[in-house]
Structure formats: structure tokens, C-alpha cells
Amino acid sequence: MSLLTEVETPTRTGWECKCSDSSDPLVVAASIIGILHLILWILDRLFFKCIYRRLKYGLKRGPSTGGVPESMREEYRQEQQSAVDVDDGHFVNIELE
């Protein structure tokens, strides 16, 4: 039994590939899609931390302050700051024996 496939055949000069319809538009489109898929996969593996961190945290920008008077914004900032200030002295130290 021969190990040769239908595509590769030995010739006097070496191995040749007999691709009958390599200029077929479907074959060309499939090749382009395959190459693009490979490039995108490589970029995804190289930069997956940056990409997914940007998708996870970059789109969340907090509540919109459009149309809110400046006095209410300042009051909100002061409430947030006072909530942070209150929690400063409430740390618990746990010592393991």
C-alpha cells in the first residue's frame, strides 16, 4: 500500500502538488479566512490580558453626571469621602500562633 495521497505524486524533478482548482474563488476565500483566523488567534494569545481587561473594566465608567447640578455632585463627593474616612480606623489585626 502506498503512502502517497491523491494530491502529491512523485515526478522526476521531485514532489509536485496537483491542485486542480486552486484558482477557484471559494478556495481563495477559504485560504484568506484561514490566514486571518490564524493571525487573530495569535494576537489574542499574545494580548489576551490587555484585551479582556479592557473589555471588562474599560467599558464601565461609573454613573453619568450629565444634567446633575454642581452642588449635588459636590455633596456626593463629600459623602463618599466621609464614608472612606470613617473606615480608616476599623482594621482588625489577627495574629496566628
UniProtKB/Swiss-Prot annotation:
Write out the GO cellular component annotations.
Answer: host cell plasma membrane; membrane; virion membrane
Q: What InterPro entries does the database record attribute to this sequence?
A: Flu_M2
A GO biological-process term: protein complex oligomerization
Alphabetically, the GO molecular function entries are: monoatomic ion channel activity; proton transmembrane transporter activity
**Entry superkingdom:** Viruses
Intravirion compartment spans: 44-97
For region Disordered, the annotated ranges are 60-83
Write out the topological domains of type Virion surface: 1-22
Transmembrane stretches, start-end: 23-43
Q: Name one Pfam family in it.
A: Flu_M2
> How does this chain assemble?
Homotetramer; composed of two disulfide-linked dimers held together by non-covalent interactions. May interact with matrix protein 1.
Query: What more is known?
Result: When the channel is activated, one or more imidazole moieties of His-37 probably become bi-protonated.
What is said about the domains? Cytoplasmic tail plays an important role in virion assembly and morphogenesis.
The task this protein performs is described as: Forms a proton-selective ion channel that is necessary for the efficient release of the viral genome during virus entry. After attaching to the cell surface, the virion enters the cell by endocytosis. Acidification of the endosome triggers M2 ion channel activity.
Report the sequence similarity comment from the record: Belongs to the influenza viruses matrix protein M2 family.
- What name is this protein filed under? Matrix protein 2
